[in-house]
Amino acid sequence: MAKFLKAGKVAVVVRGRYAGKKVVIVKPHDEGSKSHPFGHALVAGIERYPLKVTKKHGAKKVAKRTKIKPFIKVVNYNHLLPTRYTLDVEAFKSVVSTETFEQPSQREEAKKVVKKAFEERHQAGKNQWFFSKLRF
């Protein structure tokens, strides 16, 4: 079978706490690992999406409404619904790894890097679909 869950592929989580949230695959593990003996992927996603901004909003309100709250997680392939979209993950690929999940402080640092990368892409107006809430 062809490997289509590659790094950079956007997917939707269908089970658990982050169900309905969009994620981007950072590192796929098709064969599994010792700690997770099943096909899984390291993903970075958006827990809280940015809100709509209009012309009448001031600078302070715009800054507050464009904030993004990210998450990083190991997700089973069975719980991912892949989409046709892709996203560049080079900005945070080196920071999010299996070692990131060992220490809470490392996890927080990785989240900060992911947040910065996501906010830069959102401000630039790229990948607009990824930054909009999934309506269902």
UniProtKB/Swiss-Prot annotation:
| Biological process annotations from GO | cytoplasmic translation
| Top-level taxon in the UniProt lineage | Eukaryota
* Gene Ontology MF terms: structural constituent of ribosome
Kindly list the GO CC terms recorded for this protein.
cytosol; cytosolic large ribosomal subunit
Name where it mostly resides. cytoplasm
Query: Signal peptide position in this chain?
Result: none
> Per UniProt, which keywords does this protein have?
Cytoplasm, Ribonucleoprotein, Ribosomal protein
- Which InterPro entries is this protein grouped with? Ribosomal_eL27, Ribosomal_eL27_CS, Ribosomal_eL27_KOW, Ribosomal_eL27_sf, Translation_prot_SH3-like_sf
Cellular localization per UniProt = Cytoplasm
User: Which family, according to UniProt?
Assistant: Belongs to the eukaryotic ribosomal protein eL27 family.
Q: What is the protein's known function?
A: Component of the ribosome, a large ribonucleoprotein complex responsible for the synthesis of proteins in the cell. The small ribosomal subunit (SSU) binds messenger RNAs (mRNAs) and translates the encoded message by selecting cognate aminoacyl-transfer RNA (tRNA) molecules. The large subunit (LSU) contains the ribosomal catalytic site termed the peptidyl transferase center (PTC), which catalyzes the formation of peptide bonds, thereby polymerizing the amino acids delivered by tRNAs into a polypeptide chain.
- Subunit architecture: Component of the large ribosomal subunit (LSU). Mature yeast ribosomes consist of a small (40S) and a large (60S) subunit. The 40S small subunit contains 1 molecule of ribosomal RNA (18S rRNA) and 33 different proteins (encoded by 57 genes). The large 60S subunit contains 3 rRNA molecules (25S, 5.8S and 5S rRNA) and 46 different proteins (encoded by 81 genes).
Miscellaneous note of the record: Present with 7380 molecules/cell in log phase SD medium.
Could you identify this protein by its name? Large ribosomal subunit protein eL27A
Q: What is the lineage of its organism?
A: Eukaryota, Fungi, Dikarya, Ascomycota, Saccharomycotina
